[in-house]
Amino acid sequence: MSDDRTWMLRALRLATLSLGRTWPNPGVGAVVVKDGRLLGQGRHAVYGQAHAEVNALGHCRAQGLDPAGATVYVTLAPCTRHGKQPPCVAALVAALGDPNQDEAADLLAAAGIAYEEGCLEELATRLHGGFLSRVAVGRPRFTGKWAMTLDGSLATGELDSAWISSLPALASSRRRRRVFDGIVSGSGTAFHDDPSLLSAQVGERTPVRIVLSSRAELKDGSMLVATRAKAPVLVVHGAQAPADNLAALRSHAIELLAVADPHDPLQVAQALGQYGFNELLVEGGAHIHGAFLRAGLYDRLELYTGFATLGGGLPVCSGLGVATIAEGQRWEAEGPPRLLGETVALRLRRPRPVGAADQEPVVVIG
């Protein structure tokens, strides 16, 4: 691996520590290198705070090291717009371009700074895919997650699903929540299962809990309401939701987002993109998974298969309108399967274009 790729891979791994913490901004990582030596590193850790390259250069100076003449490796081109932060283009850069603006190269060149894009571009695109999706098509990147039996059931015919997955798998899946901006659930799951959708450990960051409810309803004594102080709750509702329901949710400090047709996943996706979400995990039942699969909204899947059979349980989804195997949606593995007790965990993604080169994997926490 070339030196450039080595340092960029370090920046990418650093950026994974910011997953779920910086939306609507991407969680960028940066390292400062001079004469083959690491001088400093930094990341955009929280929305509204310093950007990655600012923190990396500050790390150099805090150690009494002069970054003059160094190369800054960033996972996304530096910001050149005034917003929460001033322009931060004061160092050499090699990175993926920022889709929000294209003047970075000109500004850097005018300042006498060499600029190069494309080092580990595919990995940077994969890491920042949610942000890139929101900028390009107006919606977040969605990951569908479910636990199922060996014969593809989410639950028994009586809707019992506790627990298909092993305890190690449950703990792993809950830890994974923290790398997303939000967790999406349907109203049926919210009523029947009454999940808290919190992360695995006390004090650990939990994303925004998002419930799709056309009538803006949550169960009386809901765990989501009871745990509101631990993480925000957002209810996506229809434009004609009863005023009393909206008032009741507001009284519990529940955030509200109206869409014209909450049963249309494409409208929901656009609304959540406008809200600022980059990466969303969908945890729900057959109805919501079927709707998102039919709409082609899932970019990734995280599947947990428990070693049980039900024979006639509730299927993962239905109504995809597929008549032949060739018409089915195809996926490719994103890393090897993992054995978690009596459960196999598998991460999938939409297939890459034919001929796309394999690159070193980014280590994602979780």
Provide a role label for each language-model segment:
Residues 97-151, 167:
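Contiguous mid-protein beta-loop-alpha structural module that forms a pocket-lining wall or clamp
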Residues 1-26, 60, 141-143, 148-366:
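Enzymes that bind and transform nitrogen-containing heteroaromatic metabolites
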Residues 32-123, 208, 234, 239-241, ...:
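Zn2+-dependent cytidine deaminase-like catalytic core
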Residues 1-12, 38-43, 71-72, 119-128, ...:
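Short charge-dense sequence patches
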Residues 29:
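Helix-turn-helix
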Residues 16, 43, 94-97, 113, ...:
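A broad detector of the eukaryotic-type serine/threonine protein kinase catalytic domain
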